[in-house]
Amino acid sequence: DEELVTPILNFLLTRDIHMDAFIGGKGYTPIQCVETAQKLTVPSSIKNYIITTRTRLDNILQFIHENQLKVQKMTLNFYPAADGTLIDRETVRKFLVSNPSITTVCGGYNNLEFTRADANKGVGLRKLAEILGVNPDATMAIGDTENDLAIIEAAGIGVAMGNATDAVKARADYVTTTNTKDGVAAAIEHFIL
């Protein structure tokens, strides 16, 4: 809600980072992040996707307030300084994890993501199972980064990709092959077919 996101955004807008707010299934980026997007050290396909799929806003806080919108998720991308350390990442991470109302995870390439503490992929899987009338123990989830931990733990079978982080592999029931070696297909063949 606005009371939760306003102080967080006020802090983030003072940092030298790229950020996206996801609202109603669409991505919005503060106009000042146009420059930081060019500095990101992610594959060009990801950078192009970030740049071309976001609506740029002159004043994101005003946009949220005037339209009474709820931010579903924020993604933050960091770029490296000359010494290779990610500019502002540790400062931002400490700020975010100190807030018990949100959950902060790493979703890949130099990024952090946060949502409300009660909103994660695991909650989503349990809700979907409930809607479909499926026992959560009869579900399988596959992931590779920290933002997949909740769904891997919620699923009846949690599968880590071969290229997953060590934390994901440690919590998974099974480790499949990598994403470049059809790991999802291998897991489906192993458990379902």
Regions found by a protein language model. Name each.
Residues 7, 11, 15-17, 22-142:
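Conserved acidic, metal-coordinating active-site core of Asp-based
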